[in-house]
Amino acid sequence: MGAKLRREWLSQVLGEGTRVRPYLATHMPTLDRTVVPALAGDLRTADRREDWESEVPPREAAAAKGRDLLGGDGLACVTCHRFEGNPGLLMSVLDLAWSRTRLEWPWFRRYLVDPAAFRPGTRMPSFWPEGHSAMPDILEGDTARQIAAIWAALQEARVPGAEPAPY
């Protein structure tokens, strides 16, 4: 969790019970706020990936292309995921718009390439198996550029209500 979640989000989850998956019956317990800053820091330290630390999110990525990739004519992420408060077409799991608030870029970049490596048993497929894009006509099929474009689109995404649900 320390390499995946931004420190601010981790602190919110631990101290306030903030969540983005209201469909789950289980959740993290809310902890005494006096221990949250140290625990959040300790979790990040314990999960530190030194080889990831110098990575910074892309600054100039094609957010419009990222939205295309997220949509039904692209990788169809919106088939399963909520996006900007809109339900997924078949399921309505985690709203992708919260990614910018929750996730660290280095983790996100690696997760998209191989979700099963991070979450064995996940239903989320890899859209870049063996480094080859499922959408070769978008951004010349370049894996790094496509993932950067998705990240850019998520940085601009809106969530109605703008606050995740507390317990």
Which stretches of residues belong to each language-model region?
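Periplasmic/extracellular electron-transfer cofactor-ligation site
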Residues: 19-22, 71-93, 117-120, 159-164
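Short, structured interface segments
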Residues: 30, 35-54, 150-155
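Gly/Gly-Pro-rich "capping" loops immediately C-terminal to redox-active cysteine motifs
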Residues: 1-10, 30, 82-111, 126-129
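Electrostatic cytochrome c docking/interface patches
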Residues: 47-72, 161-167
